[in-house]
């Protein structure tokens, strides 16, 4: 099992959007000035995690625009990284922090776009949620293990 996990640990893409920059500031991930400016401009950041690295991916002005950015990025990853345009050999995951309504909307959009895909929706773990705050929404894709199919 350890060999399989070591081999596939970088074979996933995760996109996260936040409703507030407060928790990134508290955790020291952004400066107080960046948090104040982002809050003033009502920026909804879209972050990406690929492997062990968390990076800024894009900025949106509305939650709807942030979700659209995440779905577009996910579609690109499915096509180019996973070579699975229809998500038939890929798991799709949605996670949220106290944002079940938006998570269900995102799940409906994914089901419409990828009718045969395995889609899971769940709350984010507390170990992550405490760093990004309530209202956050994430979408992820990861390749299915051939050993389990």
Spell out what each predicted region is.
Residues 1-149:
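Mixed-charge interfacial surface used for oligomerization/domain docking
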């Amino acid at each position: 099992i350890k060999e399989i996990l070591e081999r596939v640990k970088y074979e996933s893409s995760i996109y996260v959007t936040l409703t507030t920059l407060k928790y990134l500031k508290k955790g020291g991930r952004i400066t107080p000035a960046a948090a104040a400016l982002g809050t003033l401009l009502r920026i909804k950041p879209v972050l990406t995690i690929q492997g062990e690295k968390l990076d800024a991916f894009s900025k949106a002005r509305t939650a709807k625009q942030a979700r659209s950015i995440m779905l577009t990025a996910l579609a690109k990853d499915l096509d180019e990284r996973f070579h699975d345009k229809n998500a038939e050999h890929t798991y799709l995951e949605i996670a949220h922090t106290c944002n079940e309504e938006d998570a269900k909307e995102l799940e409906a959009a994914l089901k419409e776009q990828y009718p045969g895909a395995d889609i899971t929706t769940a709350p984010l773990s507390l170990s992550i949620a405490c760093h990004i705050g309530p209202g956050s929404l994430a979408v992820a894709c990861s390749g299915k293990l051939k050993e389990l199919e």
